[in-house]
Design a protein with these regions (language model features):
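N-terminal nucleotide-binding beta1-loop-alpha1 segment
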Residues: 1-20, 214
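Conserved N-terminal catalytic core of the sugar/cofactor nucleotidyltransferase
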Residues: 2-5, 13, 27, 31-108
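Active-site metal-binding loops of divalent metal-dependent hydrolases
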Residues: 10, 112-113
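Alpha-helical elements of Rossmann-like donor-binding domains used by nucleotide-donor carbohydrate transfer enzymes
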Residues: 61, 91-95, 121, 204-205, ...
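A short, conserved beta-strand element in the Rossmann-like catalytic core
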Residues: 113-116, 224
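Conserved donor-nucleotide/metal-binding helix-loop-beta segment in metal-dependent transferases, i.e.
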Residues: 117-146
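Catalytic-core segments of class I nucleotidyltransferases/pyrophosphorylases
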Residues: 123-127, 158-226, 230-246
Length: 246
């Protein structure tokens, strides 16, 4: 299994912190956000390569960081240098798949996710389902729902509807940027883009997939911390206590 980490964004709301430095490498609780994610996932021993998809502006920072890690990490530079010319998350996935000629099961995630629970629970869930999967959490705030990807599910966690930032959200379940795609599904990214699948939001591909292939959304067993702007970053630094292990 390959793990693709989406890290080509420019995090403009965190300027000046991220004006010349990538958000996934900001430190929280003595470790970078990426260190928290990778150190946890690597304990399972099922991921044989981590692929960090970066823009050109920040690629050298990720290269320097990768050199300090023991696991196999490949940094893919998508060639963009400004927020206005970014490829978008789905095109970045396709770019990395094409560049590295990947033909593997894919675990795809945003590189700025900070969790208080182990990702291994989601990896086990996805491997048992052997189907496209994401995670979800309950969001009571209507205003936050308007800015989020929304999933509706049945009693078996099967996704019945998935939408992105719509004015009439169909449920209170927010999809987070963690996805599992078996290799036969990962091959469909190019087809999805040609079919008009949105390219910017990372969940756009799964929204396309779930209308064609049974897909699942696991309820998160803990909390995801949002690092969206300076204020939230400062708050997370005060609150975050690391990953709880069972």
């Amino acid at each position: 299994m390959k793990c693709l980490i989406l890290a080509a964004g420019y995090a403009t709301r965190l300027y000046p912190l991220t004006e010349n430095f990538p958000k996934p490498l900001l430190e929280v609780g003595g470790k970078t956000i990426l260190d928290w994610l990778l150190d946890d996932m690597d304990t399972m021993g099922v991921i044989d390569e981590y692929v960090v998809i970066s823009n050109h502006k920040y690629a050298h920072h990720f290269e320097s960081w990768a050199a300090t890690k023991k696991m196999k990490i490949t940094v893919v530079d998508d060639g963009t240098s400004t927020n206005e010319t970014r490829l978008g998350a789905v095109r970045d996935i396709q770019f990395a798949v094409d560049q590295l000629r990947l033909e593997d099961d894919l675990l795809v995630m945003a590189g700025d996710n900070l969790l208080d629970f182990s990702m291994t629970s989601f990896i086990r869930y996805a491997m048992e389902k052997n189907a496209p999967c994401t995670m979800r959490y309950y969001e009571p705030s209507f205003q936050k729902l308007l800015k989020s990807g929304i999933v509706s599910v049945d009693e078996q966690d099967t996704i019945t509807l998935m939408t992105e930032k719509v004015p009439d959200p169909a449920s209170n379940w927010v999809s987070v940027a963690f996805y599992y795609y078996p290799k036969d599904v990962a091959k469909l990214i190019g087809q999805a883009l040609a079919d008009g699948c949105g390219a910017d939001a990372p969940g756009s591909f799964l929204a396309w997939v779930c209308r064609r292939i049974p897909s699942y959304a696991m309820e998160m067993p803990g909390k995801r911390y949002d690092v969206g702007d300076i204020a939230s970053y400062e708050q997370v630094q005060k609150e975050y206590r690391g990953i709880e292990t069972c």
